[in-house]
Amino acid sequence: MSITHLLIDIEGTTCPVSFVSEVLFPYAKQSLSSYLNDHQEDLDLKNILQEAEREWDGDPSPDSIKLRQATRNQNLNFIDSIKVYFEYLINVDRKSTALKDLQGKIWDNGYRKGEITSHLFNETTECLKRWHRRQLSLSVYSSGSIQAQKLLYRHTNDGDLEHLFDHWFDTHTGNKKECASYRKIATKISTNPSEILFISDNGEECDAAGASGMETLFSLRDGNPDQSPRSHRVIKTLNDVDEYL
């Protein structure tokens, strides 16, 4: 079967890892305390904080359990207590859905204030537009929240690219390293997995997508943490993707 859908990762695939690690993550960490204090009455934030509390209650990590007990011993209020957990999640680089949702809210605030602009790889915009013109369906699957994904493409150095994508998936769909997540995506977009090409800079994610029946491409670039493509076909620029369509 021919490829009709592209399922595309973000970090290390369409934008440099450095933009996420040196701009987005530090901005969210720096703004965490003030955002929680300023928006604690917002319903969306309350829902995120409740989810974080559920995650914390079920977190088996010894360090997390110690933190939980320490905050109780200090009689911290809810906001100050949950902030401690978010800071812990950030420091251990946990792929927490509640944290990702909160970061999306903080980044939304930053984009709106003009304090953040997304930086993509030089060829990304033209490649996305070219594939869109070819009537390929473009979807995003990233560990960042769907809100964060849309913000990133809405506020790029090349303008608003959000309209080029048909579907958005994050960790609410499932872990990116689990085959079931990709099967769920194929079902969601009503497409045979063999017609979907997944592009990522992570070998384990490519393994999981491949196990679901999807075609895969491994994004191998300087600066990407994972430099081992395993058995997956390699691209060094998004322009290389066309060879496999």
UniProtKB/Swiss-Prot annotation:
Alphabetic keyword roster: Amino-acid biosynthesis, Hydrolase, Magnesium, Metal-binding, Methionine biosynthesis
Cofactor: Mg(2+)
Protein's pathway: Amino-acid biosynthesis; L-methionine biosynthesis via salvage pathway; L-methionine from S-methyl-5-thio-alpha-D-ribose 1-phosphate: step 3/6; Amino-acid biosynthesis; L-methionine biosynthesis via salvage pathway; L-methionine from S-methyl-5-thio-alpha-D-ribose 1-phosphate: step 4/6
Cofactor notes: Binds 1 Mg(2+) ion per subunit.
Catalysed conversion reaction: 5-methylsulfanyl-2,3-dioxopentyl phosphate + H2O = 1,2-dihydroxy-5-(methylsulfanyl)pent-1-en-3-one + phosphate
SUPFAM superfamilies: HAD-like
Keyword match Cell cycle: no
GO BP: any one term: L-methionine salvage from methylthioadenosine
GO MF entry, a single one: magnesium ion binding
UniProt-listed Enzyme Commission number(s): 3.1.3.77
Pfam families per the UniProt record, alphabetical: Hydrolase
Function per UniProt: Bifunctional enzyme that catalyzes the enolization of 2,3-diketo-5-methylthiopentyl-1-phosphate (DK-MTP-1-P) into the intermediate 2-hydroxy-3-keto-5-methylthiopentenyl-1-phosphate (HK-MTPenyl-1-P), which is then dephosphorylated to form the acireductone 1,2-dihydroxy-3-keto-5-methylthiopentene (DHK-MTPene).
Family: Belongs to the HAD-like hydrolase superfamily. MasA/MtnC family.
Subunit structure: Monomer.
HAMAP family tied to this protein: Salvage_MtnC (MF_01681)
Protein name: Enolase-phosphatase E1
Gene name as annotated: mtnC
